[in-house]
Structures are given as structure tokens and as C-alpha cells.
Amino acid sequence: MARLTAYERRKFRVRNRIKRTGRLRLSVFRSLKHIYAQIIDDEKGVTLVSASSLALKLKGNKTEVARQVGRALAEKALALGIKQVAFDRGPYKYHGRVKALAEGAREGGLEF
């Protein structure tokens, strides 16, 4: 059996804590150029809402773009009646672009 990397251990630890809450999960994925966010219903295994800097064709400062993606995701979620989610930062530290996305989602009206 292969040993897990620190990245994988962190990802599983954070995700298992969030799944116990029973809330919808706001999951974040960060690449070198773009940031992606989606709200997932783990009970049904369905993505309800998604937004990304790639789909929105946003350019500029990556931190500010992440904030705009968070706002866009919150607007889509509120349109579907989703107000409360659990923030799944995955293996990433709550800092920089991940933090900016979370703040943008809060500004847009999501609670977590």
C-alpha cells in the first residue's frame, strides 16, 4: 500500500470533517492560472452550482479574480435558494486566493 503524501492526508482530513456537518459543501480547486469553486450535495453526489475564473473569462490579479469568482458563485447559489454551506478548502491553506474566494462568497451572501 502506498503511503499518503501530506497533501492527500490534509485533503482527506479536511473533507471528512466537513462531510460530518451534513451541509452542502463549497469545494475549491486552485491551479496555477485559475481558481474553480463548486457547491456539492454529498448525499446525492451532485454538483449544484459552479463558477471559475476560466468560465467567467476574468483576467488580472489572481487574488482579486478569486474574490470575483466567490461573488459569482454566491449569486448563483442564492438564485437556487442556497444560503448555508460548509467551506471545503481541500489541501490548501486558508490564505491568499482561497481566502479571497471565501470572502467574496461571504460578501455575495453565503454563510459558512
UniProtKB/Swiss-Prot annotation:
Q: Which molecular-function annotations from GO does this UniProt entry contain?
A: 5S rRNA binding; structural constituent of ribosome
Name the Pfam families on file.
Answer: Ribosomal_L18p
Q: Extract the InterPro entries matched here.
A: Ribosomal_uL18_bac-type, Ribosomal_uL18_bac/euk
Query: A biological process (GO) annotation for this entry?
Result: translation
Complex and partners:
Part of the 50S ribosomal subunit; part of the 5S rRNA/L5/L18/L25 subcomplex. Contacts the 5S and 23S rRNAs.
Q: What does this protein do?
A: This is one of the proteins that bind and probably mediate the attachment of the 5S RNA into the large ribosomal subunit, where it forms part of the central protuberance.
Family according to the record:
Belongs to the universal ribosomal protein uL18 family.
Protein name as it appears in the record: Large ribosomal subunit protein uL18
Q: Which source organism does the UniProt entry give? A: Thermus thermophilus (strain ATCC BAA-163 / DSM 7039 / HB27)
